[in-house]
């Protein structure tokens, strides 16, 4: 995957133009372009899918945010079919997990620590499986469309008191993808355990989310906050990268000038 500039997170037209540029320059069918699932990113995702650009939707934190980009993906595919174009355009929707618990643990009693991210994931998986079973999607699949896969992101455990394979065990779910840090991968290979696969009906997600709300966490507002903070963090990293490249260029230019003088 290669991301559009995070400076475009609130710029629909700019995101579309950047996605087209990356796709054209990359010239690889397996190159996914990252577009954040912000309100401004959603229409850009639909348009990019319509244009045949594989998209990795980033910065999703809630079921509602996931459903918005799932809808955008299907609209893009439907438009391709109406235009007589190939409906096979790849996409993944990346739901960030561990940041929920980092943000909420301090507000919750011990028995609810590290429960919010998993519950949101269960709730979102239920919506994902309902989408796959819907007549609307079945019609698209029959025409040759590929499902937009739900991807579990940020699955490294941040809480030192929790299992280092917590989110890997919890997110064993058919038809999904789990991206994990190398350290977490090795930990699971060494001592990880599975206790079955995720329930398609959401399991105990609704009950857990109700308890967390009762404890004082505004889950809907927190989802918006996490997405905004995630976008801001991406911008900070982007500037750091550009500053590093500029500094390296200055160093190389200095060495080149020195070589000429000698």
What residue ranges belong to the model's regions?
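Active-site beta->alpha loop and helix N-cap motifs at the rims of alpha/beta catalytic domains
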Residues: 1-44
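Conserved, mostly hydrophobic/aromatic
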Residues: 2, 33, 48, 181, ...
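Aromatic/hydrophobic pocket-lining residues that form the small-molecule binding cavity
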Residues: 15, 41, 66, 121, ...
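Generic structural signal for well-ordered alpha-helices
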Residues: 16-23, 45, 66, 70, ...
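Glycine-enriched alpha-helix->loop->beta-strand junction motifs that scaffold or abut catalytic
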Residues: 27, 44-55
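Short catalytic-loop micro-motif centered on adjacent basic/acidic residues
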Residues: 31-35, 55-59, 221
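Catalytic alpha/beta core domains of metabolic enzymes, predominantly
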Residues: 53-183
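Flexible, acidic glycine-rich loops studded with aromatic residues
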Residues: 144-250
């Amino acid at each position: 995957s290669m991301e559009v500039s995070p400076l475009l997170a609130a710029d629909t037209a700019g995101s579309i133009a950047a996605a087209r540029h990356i796709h054209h320059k990359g010239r690889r069918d397996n190159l996914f372009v990252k577009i954040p699932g912000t309100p401004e990113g959603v229409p850009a995702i639909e348009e990019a899918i319509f244009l045949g650009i594989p998209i990795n939707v980033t910065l999703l934190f809630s079921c509602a945010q996931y459903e918005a980009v799932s809808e955008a993906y299907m609209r893009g595919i439907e438009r391709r079919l109406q235009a007589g174009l190939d409906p096979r355009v790849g996409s993944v929707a990346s739901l960030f997990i561990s940041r929920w618990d980092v943000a909420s643990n301090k507000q919750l009693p011990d028995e609810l620590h590290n429960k919010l991210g998993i519950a949101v994931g269960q709730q979102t998986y239920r919506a994902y499986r309902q989408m796959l079973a819907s007549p609307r999607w079945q019609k698209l699949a029959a025409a040759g469309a590929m499902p937009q896969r739900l991807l579990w992101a940020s699955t490294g455990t941040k809480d030192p008191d929790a299992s280092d394979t917590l989110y890997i065990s919890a997110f064993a779910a058919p038809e999904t993808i789990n991206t994990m840090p190398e350290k977490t991968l090795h930990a699971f290979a060494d001592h990880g355990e599975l206790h079955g696969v995720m329930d398609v009906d959401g399991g105990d997600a609704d009950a857990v989310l109700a308890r967390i709300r009762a404890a004082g966490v505004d889950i809907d507002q927190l989802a918006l906050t996490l997405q905004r903070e995630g976008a801001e963090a991406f911008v900070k990293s982007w500037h750091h990268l550009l500053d590093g490249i500029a500094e390296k260029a200055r160093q190389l230019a200095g060495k080149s000038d020195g070589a000429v003088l000698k």
